[in-house]
Regions:
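Active-site glycine/GP-rich loop and adjacent strand/helix microenvironment
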Residues: 136, 149, 168-170, 184-189
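Gly/Ser/Thr-rich phosphate-binding loop
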Residues: 43, 68-73, 78, 82-144, ...
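Conserved ANL (AMP-binding/adenylate-forming) active-site segment centered on the GW(Y/F)…HTG consensus within
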Residues: 142-143, 181-200
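Conserved AMP-binding/adenylation subdomain of ANL enzymes
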Residues: 5-22, 30-70, 84
Length: 200
């Protein structure tokens, strides 16, 4: 479970979470990003609101009612949320919104930023096996909207050739994540573990 603790430290570092935050856990807790809302809140002393919603409008109602300062969600939910009118009160409290689980469509990102212009967008990339790998800092979003960003704290991200050597700039290769955030393998499945995990 050390990688979950390392993940909570990493996420709370780059999102700047603190004890006065209120995070909304709208994603399933069985999904690493959903569970991460709990561990990040526990690590930073923040308040976390669990939400089992039926409609996207329920998410907005909870954000307004609970004065949510941080929201992490996946593109399908953000697409639905971006089509709705947001209560103005959400923008008074929401400090950031973070995307995970797939690429955020540019038009969705633009719509969200128009609804909550003071909230910082954090675009994240990662694998379930390795928690998160990278994030694009908010100040880079306009300049490099399609970038996966830089390594999160406690992660080392490399681009390697087939022989295991590091690629040069603009050279294609395999994206490799190593460090404290990477799981040790698949439970009771040494064959799959050997297939996907490599010692570097």
């Amino acid at each position: 479970h050390r990688n979950m603790v390392a993940g909570a430290k990493s996420v709370s570092t780059y999102l700047g979470n603190h004890s006065s935050d209120t995070l909304l856990a709208a994603l399933p807790l069985s999904f690493d990003a959903g569970f991460s809302q709990l561990t990040t809140a526990f690590h930073s002393g923040a308040r976390v609101v669990l939400l089992n919603y039926l409609l996207p409008r329920d998410v907005l109602k909870a954000m307004e009612r609970e004065k949510v300062t941080g929201l992490t969600a996946v593109p399908p939910l953000y697409i639905q949320l971006s089509a709705l009118e947001w209560p103005a009160a959400i923008g008074e409290h929401l400090r950031y919104f973070a995307n995970t689980g797939g690429r955020m469509p540019r038009e969705t990102l633009a719509a969200l930023r128009a609804r909550v212009p003071k909230a910082k967008p954090f675009l994240m990339y990662g694998l379930t096996e390795a928690f998160r790998s990278t994030y694009l800092p908010p100040e880079e979003v306009d300049r490099r909207p399609d970038s996966i960003g830089k390594a999160i704290p406690n992660a080392e991200i490399l681009v390697l050739r087939e022989d295991g050597s590091e690629c040069g700039p603009d050279e294609p290769g395999e994206l490799v994540h190593r460090g404290a955030l990477v799981g040790q393998g698949y439970w009771n499945d040494p064959e799959k573990t050997a297939e996907r995990y490599k010692l570097l």
